[in-house]
């Protein structure tokens, strides 16, 4: 889920599971510890610990999706330093990152860093753009009406991971780019989960 790693939980976003559920997919929406009590590296580890338990509940491919900070976390799960168990990494079928944060360096100078407590080393280590591109489909969707910083983040990831499928959604902004997740007939879900 989004919230700049500082706010929110799965309950705020559970309605977005409707599209995948209607297509017959199992869906898990984990919450995670929040900053400032946690650091971003710790949040990444928390999701990496939760993912095997969630995936063990079902067979078949695993698709990861996230929005904003959650998009960052979904992308991080495909980075080799996270160390997902091999059997789980082999099940990863696709990642859908909606308005993700892919390079955390700009956050070092922002007031919110008082809560995030990022230093340059952690910002680099936690930035997907500084890790090798995974060998699986990565879809990034960002709203055309987003703030320029979110458009930049999507473009930086597409540059760093050249096989990324980037969609700039006309008329969408940071808070409604996620809406197609709840529609089982959405082209976004076709691209992510298959027709």
Which residues make up each language-model segment?
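C-terminal catalytic histidine-bearing segment of alpha/beta-hydrolase fold enzymes
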Residues: 151, 155, 162-195
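Active-site loop/turn elements of alpha/beta-hydrolase fold enzymes
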Residues: 25, 32-34, 100, 169-171
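Active-site catalytic pocket residues across diverse enzymes, especially alpha/beta-hydrolases
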Residues: 81-85, 161, 185
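Active-site glycine-rich loops that stabilize anionic/oxyanionic intermediates
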Residues: 1-6
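The feature captures the conserved acid-bearing segment of alpha/beta-hydrolase catalytic domains
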Residues: 94-109, 120-156
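Primarily recognizes the serine-hydrolase "nucleophile elbow" in alpha/beta-hydrolase
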Residues: 49-112
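Catalytic nucleophile-loop/oxyanion-hole region of alpha/beta-hydrolase
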Residues: 7-17, 28-61
